Amino acid sequence: MSKSSSGDSKNTLYCSFCGKSQHEVRKLIAGPTVFICDECVELCMDIIREENKTTLVKSRDGVPTPRDIHAVLDDYVIGQHHAKRVLSVAVHNHYKRLAHGTKHNDVELAKSNILLVGPTGCGKTLLAQTLARIIDVPFTMADATTLTEAGYVREDVENIILKLLQAARLQRRAAQRGIVYIDEVDKISRKSDNPSITRDVSGEGVQQALLKIMEGTVASVPPQGGRKHPQQEFLQVDTSNILFICGGAFAGLDKIIAQRGKGTSIGFGADVRGPDERSTGDILREVEPEDLLKFGLIPEFIGRLPVVATLSDLDETALVEILTKPKNALVKQYQRLFEMEDVRLEFSDDALRTISHKAIQRKTGARGLRSIMESILLDPMFDLPGLSGVESILVNKEVVEGRAKPLYVHAERRGEQQAPGA
């Protein structure tokens, strides 16, 4: 049994694994002959989670089932069940195709790239990142607004493949099975329904440049990037088995879809329905290729993205869940940060709802939650390293609204008091 037997601390108990005393940890669990602290229990749980994740990835010839993929996505992404279902099936089929070969009895299995349509901050990027972790393949992101056709100033589309190769630590075979997420593809729509007379190198031109690498080609990739080193040896990367996921907010697409669904007749046969009361997410779910064409994507580009998953706006309830429920939830991250100072960070329910309401007002979705949290916790994070005796900090609705300072609870008095300088 881990006990000290000298001086005043003869009755002090210690963790049998890390050696910390009962005063240095929050909980110390006693067994028949040993003790284990809460920190070691958490470490054990992390190890078990990693083992479970490895087991998932190795199931069924290395291809997890759609249900398994969906379950892991649920751990990290709140809501968006329809999108997660579509993605789970698409990713499962893609890597099953690679595991069993693309050709069998003269039947060639074509690649199905994915288009994610949804407002800013609804989880598009997080979904793509989590999928790459589940399958355990290299992953890279690119911003479509920074791309241009080869030969023009800005970034060549081939640099996307270079980034993927770097993510794979220059292992070409691994890179050729990776996932590429291209964000803001709605920003490279052409400026009108008719083909432009002048060269559109950052809109339609980028769509044209992306076509070949998305469908499958052998790309010549400069290891040092760009074309400034003409003597360098180019790497040949086959993009046929790289899964491309494109995402964008597509602001205004819902209006195009709704307009298509409206009747144009007059008289007795007229469509007399009132304004569409459905949510934006429900309308987007009815998207058709013709709607994307009207929005400004070229037919060939639409054809390279046969799987379309639509995401909905996040409401206040969903944002509160995003703050608290996922394994890497923001509240958990900041609580861990404060634990490093031996301080417990607590949020009231109305504080969480107010934070979520602020994010909705800013129209930033889940992406805006971190900046709000940083603003709220700036003073405590500044003061805490120089203070002693603080046991916990409470954030309530008034703190989020800027009408009060966070409440500090001191260990010796166990009474609430405002932050220093309040």
Curated annotation (Swiss-Prot):
InterPro entries: AAA+_ATPase, ATP-dep_Clp_protease_ClpX, ATPase_AAA_core, Clp_ATPase_C, Clp_protease_ATP-bd_su_ClpX, ClpX_bact, P-loop_NTPase, Znf_CppX_C4. Keywords: ATP-binding, Chaperone, Metal-binding, Nucleotide-binding, Zinc. Zn(2+) binds at residues 15, 18, 37, 40. ATP-dependent specificity component of the Clp protease. It directs the protease to specific substrates. Can perform chaperone functions in the absence of ClpP. Belongs to the ClpX chaperone family. PROSITE patterns: CLPX_ZB (PS51902). Residues 3-56 form the ClpX-type ZB domain. It comes from Azospirillum brasilense. One of its GO terms (biological process) is proteolysis involved in protein catabolic process. ATP binds at residues 119-126. It comes from the Bacteria. CDD domains: RecA-like_ClpX. Component of the ClpX-ClpP complex. Forms a hexameric ring that, in the presence of ATP, binds to fourteen ClpP subunits assembled into a disk-like structure with a central cavity, resembling the structure of eukaryotic proteasomes. GO terms for cellular component: HslUV protease complex. One of its GO terms (molecular function) is unfolded protein binding. This is ATP-dependent Clp protease ATP-binding subunit ClpX.
